[in-house]
Design a protein with these regions (language model features):
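Expand to "…catalyze enediolate/carbanion chemistry for C-C bond making/breaking, isomerization
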Residues: 1-302
Length: 302
């Protein structure tokens, strides 16, 4: 199974929409999330639960990491888990996590269903979804509430509503929240999955993803399968970036051999932090190439 740190695109798919669930496997998204909460009306949740095992089998065959987002545990969440765990999802996401106890409760319930379904105890990862201000300011504690947590995901619409923010394509209203969330996830040692871009705008999602990557994000959630190839491309070091990283490393190491503390490359001073970042970029490019050998769909269409 691909580790969370190498998963760039996390696609939410309506849980009872059979056509969307089938098509998702061809989207190229690294993680496919059957969404049983907001994307699935209560009257259709039983149908979504019934579909889960077959959908997960098809998604695995397509090379994706399989995830599901159920409902809060004090709502329909337990019924969701009882059904979907039969399909052994790789990741269980929990919406509206506002405190560490929500994660601990999910951990206990997932362990119970792992035992009941013959799944290796502890093998199912958890993905807390941060959707309220109260959860955002406790992200470190939430991320560390269970060893199953490898990543946390930031919401956009519910968080904006909780803040009373006015939504816009430029995302300015959530800029601080996205930066704060990233810092908390890095401090906790987990992957930060950025909020989705919720407009049907290819140029917009590319700008938004590249801005997120500049901050330090390496993963982004999405609600439109057409965005998967764009996000994957933006979150993957390009050939030009790899070439520049190699030049930077060579320039810095040559300067060190001459006894100089820094180098200059393209008019910019290169010191130890930049050298380390370049090494990390090369390592990530190699890991991504190994983890995702399948070709990406054409982001510009057929």
């Amino acid at each position: 199974m691909i580790p969370s740190r190498l998963c760039r695109s996390w696609l939410f798919v309506p849980g009872a929409d059979e056509a969307a669930l089938t098509a998702a496997g061809a989207s190229g998204a690294d993680v496919l999330i059957q969404e049983l909460e907001d994307f699935t009306p209560p009257a259709r949740r039983a149908q979504a639960r019934m579909l889960a095992p077959g959908v997960y089998q098809a998604w695995r065959a397509a090379g994706a990491v399989v995830a599901v987002r159920g409902n809060p545990l004090d709502g329909d969440g337990i019924d969701d888990l009882a059904a979907v765990m039969r399909g052994a999802p790789d990741i269980v996401a929990l919406p509206k996590v506002a405190e560490p106890d929500h994660v601990r409760w999910l951990d206990r319930e997932v362990a119970r269903f792992e035992r009941d379904c013959g799944i290796a105890i502890g093998s199912t990862r958890l993905l807390p979804n941060i959707e309220f201000a109260r959860g955002l300011v406790q992200t470190v504690a939430i991320a560390q509430a269970s060893p199953r947590v490898e990543a946390c995901l930031l919401a956009s619409e519910d968080l904006a509503a909780d803040l009373g923010a006015e939504r816009g394509r430029d995302g300015l209203e959530l800029a601080y929240a996205r930066q704060r969330f990233l810092v908390e996830c890095v401090a906790a040692g987990v992957v930060a999955v950025d909020a989705p871009y919720t407009w049907r705008d290819a140029d917009g999602v590319e700008r938004d993803t590249r801005w997120a990557r500049r901050l330090g994000y390496r993963a982004k959630s999405l609600v439109d399968p057409a965005h998967a190839a764009i996000v994957n491309r933006a979150m993957t070091p390009s050939a030009d970036e790899v070439a520049r990283a190699r030049r930077l490393i060579a320039a810095f190491e040559s300067a060190r051999e001459r006894g100089e503390p820094r180098a200059e490359l393209d008019g910019s001073l290169v010191e130890v932090p930049a050298w380390r970042n370049a090494q990390r970029l090369l390592a990530r490019a190699a890991e991504l190439a190994d983890a995702h050998p399948r070709p990406l769909p054409n982001a510009d269409g057929p």
